[in-house]
């Protein structure tokens, strides 16, 4: 039996709309849900196997994308949010009641500072960028997944057209390396 990766992948990937203008994310609380308005579409939307990202119940992976932080605004019940681990690079703001991660923000110097991490499946609107790749695939082993099953996981991703990586995609790794070289003075600040 094939593993459950994530509903947005297992149920068939729906192509997003490149002109999509954003929408509202809602936590899972039936009463007074936290609402976060995203003022645009996400980029680099991907399946993530790390142990820190929020995943729907029964899923091995989260699906997470990034959006400029100035396009992220909490519009309802902000008092219900708390940071799960304030020592982490990505400060994941989750609902205290239902546990859903609403957005992750980086405050420390980092190549992705200025981008917030969000789960667009929390929105009813259609048009969000579809998953582009799968990252940190081997990390599911750290969470108790039998390593003998990882080839099957990779095959399942490839069957829906997603490339798999054990870090991030090459484009994102290049961005991280470029930022690091710029910080160390090995590359000019503007390329």
Curated annotation (Swiss-Prot):
<feature type="binding site">
    <location>
        <position position="27"/>
    </location>
    <ligand>
        <name>Zn(2+) 1</name>
    </ligand>
</feature>
<dbReference type="Pfam" id="PF04828">
    <property type="entry name" value="GFA"/>
</dbReference>
<feature type="binding site">
    <location>
        <position position="95"/>
    </location>
    <ligand>
        <name>Zn(2+) 1</name>
    </ligand>
</feature>
<dbReference type="GO" id="GO:0051907">
    <property type="term" value="F:S-(hydroxymethyl)glutathione synthase activity"/>
</dbReference>
<feature type="binding site">
    <location>
        <position position="29"/>
    </location>
    <ligand>
        <name>Zn(2+) 1</name>
    </ligand>
</feature>
<comment type="similarity">
    <text>Belongs to the Gfa family.</text>
</comment>
<comment type="function">
    <text>Catalyzes the condensation of formaldehyde and glutathione to S-hydroxymethylglutathione.</text>
</comment>
<feature type="domain" description="CENP-V/GFA">
    <location>
        <begin position="20"/>
        <end position="166"/>
    </location>
</feature>
<keyword id="KW-0862">Zinc</keyword>
<dbReference type="GO" id="GO:0008270">
    <property type="term" value="F:zinc ion binding"/>
</dbReference>
<keyword id="KW-0456">Lyase</keyword>
<feature type="binding site">
    <location>
        <position position="53"/>
    </location>
    <ligand>
        <name>Zn(2+) 2</name>
    </ligand>
</feature>
<dbReference type="InterPro" id="IPR006913">
    <property type="entry name" value="CENP-V/GFA"/>
</dbReference>
<dbReference type="InterPro" id="IPR011057">
    <property type="entry name" value="Mss4-like_sf"/>
</dbReference>
<dbReference type="GO" id="GO:0046294">
    <property type="term" value="P:formaldehyde catabolic process"/>
</dbReference>
<feature type="binding site">
    <location>
        <position position="98"/>
    </location>
    <ligand>
        <name>Zn(2+) 1</name>
    </ligand>
</feature>
<feature type="binding site">
    <location>
        <position position="50"/>
    </location>
    <ligand>
        <name>Zn(2+) 2</name>
    </ligand>
</feature>
<keyword id="KW-0479">Metal-binding</keyword>
<dbReference type="InterPro" id="IPR014185">
    <property type="entry name" value="Formald_GSH"/>
</dbReference>
<comment type="pathway">
    <text>One-carbon metabolism; formaldehyde degradation; formate from formaldehyde (glutathione route): step 1/3.</text>
</comment>
<protein>
    <recommendedName>
        <fullName>Putative glutathione-dependent formaldehyde-activating enzyme</fullName>
        <ecNumber>4.4.1.22</ecNumber>
    </recommendedName>
</protein>
<feature type="binding site">
    <location>
        <position position="48"/>
    </location>
    <ligand>
        <name>Zn(2+) 2</name>
    </ligand>
</feature>
């Amino acid at each position: 039996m094939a593993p459950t990766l994530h509903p947005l992948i297992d149920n068939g990937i729906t192509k997003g709309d490149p002109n999509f203008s954003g929408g509202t994310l809602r936590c899972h609380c039936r009463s007074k849900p936290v609402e976060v308005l995203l003022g645009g579409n996400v980029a680099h939307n991907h399946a993530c196997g790390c142990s820190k990202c929020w995943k729907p119940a029964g899923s091995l992976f989260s699906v997470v994308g990034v959006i400029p932080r100035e396009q992220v605004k909490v519009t309802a019940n902000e008092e219900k949010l708390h940071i799960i681990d304030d020592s982490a690079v990505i400060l994941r703001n989750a609902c205290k009641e239902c546990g859903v991660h609403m957005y992750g923000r980086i405050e420390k110097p980092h190549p992705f500072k200025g981008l917030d991490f969000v789960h667009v499946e929390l929105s009813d609107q259609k048009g969000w960028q579809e998953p582009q790749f799968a990252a940190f695939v081997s990390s599911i082993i750290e969470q108790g997944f039998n390593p003998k099953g990882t080839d099957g996981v990779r095959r399942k991703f490839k069957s829906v057209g997603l490339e798999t990586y054990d870090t991030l995609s090459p484009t994102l790794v290049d961005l991280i390396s470029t930022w690091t070289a710029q910080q160390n003075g090995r590359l000019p600040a503007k390329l």
